Design a protein with these regions (language model features):
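Class I S-adenosyl-L-methionine-dependent methyltransferase catalytic core
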Residues: 1-196
Length: 196
């Protein structure tokens, strides 16, 4: 399968987190997340670097708990950090602090290019969607107002027009076999080198 390159990649990794402390001891609470998770090394090892065009925008969701690791993932995938967009929720949960925010790190590959609207706010307020871990639809509008096609959503929950998707809850448009993607990227680089 030939992989295309993307100008926009949105990722909402299924960070490996479990309920802990007092929260886990409450009998009526779920102790495990209602979906499969990946550890940080598994997320880092996804071949995202090979799917990104020069100037590609990366929008990487993270929780407060995994903020440090999200920066590591961004760097491993070959992106440079530019800013953080914070989603302020109307309610939250937590043991010691009530966490009402989630963050999306924005980065770019090689050079930062904006061909569309700029000067967007880095904080937004939106209601919490009905499904666990789902992000607000307004965020897609924000991305589409800034970042170009081709667009790819990783760990997608549903298909959105104008986007390719990959995830265990959707019919994926791409395969993310690390070796397959890396081999194809090497062949593509070899072709470009021989033409130069």
């Amino acid at each position: 399968m030939k992989h295309k390159k993307y100008k926009t990649i949105l990722a909402d990794p299924c960070w490996e987190q479990k309920m802990a402390g007092k929260y886990a001891t409450r009998h009526k609470r779920i102790r495990e997340l209602p979906y499969p998770t990946m550890n940080v090394e598994q997320i880092k090892n996804l071949p995202i670097k090979d799917l990104a065009e020069e100037g590609c925008h990366l929008w990487l969701w993270t929780t407060n708990q995994f903020l440090k690791e999200a920066f590591e993932v961004m760097e491993t995938w070959g992106f440079k950090y530019l800013t953080t967009i914070t989603w302020v929720k109307p309610s939250g949960c937590g043991n010691w602090f009530v966490s009402r925010t989630q963050h999306c790190l924005f980065g770019y590959k090689d050079k930062c290019q904006f061909k569309k609207a700029r000067y967007k706010p880095t904080v937004f307020f939106a209601n919490i969607p009905k499904r666990h871990s789902e992000k607000p639809m307004e965020f897609y509008d924000l991305i589409e107002s800034i970042s170009d096609e081709n667009r790819l959503e990783l760990f997608a929950r549903q298909k959105r027009e104008g986007w390719d998707v990959w995830g265990n809850e959707v019919n994926s448009d791409i395969k993310l076999n690390s070796e397959e993607v890396k081999q194809e990227a090497m062949q593509s680089e070899a072709r470009h080198s021989s033409q130069a």
